[in-house]
Design a protein with these regions (language model features):
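A conserved active-site cap/scaffold subdomain adjacent to cofactor or substrate pockets
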Residues: 164-172, 176-215, 219
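Catalytic beta/alpha-barrel core
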Residues: 104-112, 128-137
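Conserved, mostly hydrophobic/aromatic
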Residues: 13, 76, 122
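Active-site beta->alpha loop and helix N-cap motifs at the rims of alpha/beta catalytic domains
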Residues: 17, 26-107, 111-114
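Conserved small/polar residues in nucleotide/adenosyl-binding loops
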Residues: 240-247
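Glycine-enriched alpha-helix->loop->beta-strand junction motifs that scaffold or abut catalytic
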Residues: 6-7, 121-129
Length: 249
């Protein structure tokens, strides 16, 4: 299926796992075993999730190996309850990566003011990171520099940076979903056909415009001396994700 469908990796989140665990009896035996062993709810949840993620990493390992580490990653996010706690985010990211113990694992960290310092520190530890919740060009630029700072810190320790990968989950589709809704609301109260036509013409295009601006900023960054120095040591470029449409219309 991976080959036939061209699947190059998988992401996950607590909502996906909640739906899978609550709606599938295959987890019941492991849950009952955890209860019998006196494990807490969190311990049972993590044992189920870590196993699923580890198995997924193994399934996609051939993709990871065949592409030289460009594809084949499985993402798992740190608990949303610590999104505003840099230190906890760092420690949980390291704990997750150590517990699952797969080189094609990516840890999802939100690109918030508290999350970006964690991104740099986790990258410096040699852990792959998927930076999420990026909606603006500014947030993308900040993420790129956080990634670079993490690579620089690791290189300064004399450790390799050629096997570290990072993805910027720049949520293009969600921008259009929200902006289009605002445009639709405004169109109801506009009588001028010229103005209406201009607004209609913008629908579905704001996110792409945002991405084009971000790409120009990306080119400036990779043409700079700091990135060139890292690239010479084998650093991988920061990639995009989440460009697919979400508007059901």
């Amino acid at each position: 299926m991976i080959t036939e469908k061209g699947i190059r990796g998988i992401t996950s989140n607590p909502a996906i796992f909640e739906k899978a665990i609550a709606g599938n009896a295959i987890y019941d035996a492991d849950i009952e075993a955890g209860i019998s062993a006196g494990k807490s709810v969190i311990e049972i949840y993590e044992s189920l999730v870590f196993k699923d993620i580890r198995d997924a990493c193994d399934i996609f390992m051939p993709v990871y190996e065949q592409t030289g580490g460009l594809d084949g990653y499985i993402s798992i996010e740190v608990p949303p309850t610590i999104a505003k706690d840099t230190e906890s985010t760092v420690s949980e990211a390291i704990r997750y990566y150590t517990a699952i113990s797969r080189e094609n694992l990516m840890i999802k960290i939100p690109g918030t003011p508290e999350g970006l310092p964690a991104v740099s520190r986790v990258i410096s530890e040699g852990i792959n990171v998927n930076v999420t919740l990026l909606f603006s060009v500014e947030s993308y630029i900040n993420t790129a520099w956080a990634y670079i700072e993490g690579l620089e810190a690791r290189a300064a320790k004399g450790e390799g940076i050629n096997k570290i990968a990072s993805v910027a989950s720049f949520f293009l589709s969600r921008i259009d979903s929200n902006i289009d809704g605002i445009i639709d609301s405004k169109l109801k109260n506009i009588a001028d056909e010229t103005v209406k036509a201009k607004l209609e013409a913008v629908k579905g295009k704001v996110a792409i415009a945002n991405a084009k601006i971000a790409y120009q900023e990306y080119k400036k960054i990779i043409q700079g001396d700091r990135w060139k120095a890292l690239s010479a040591k084998g650093a991988n470029c920061l990639l995009y994700t989440s460009p697919s449409p979400r508007d059901s219309r």
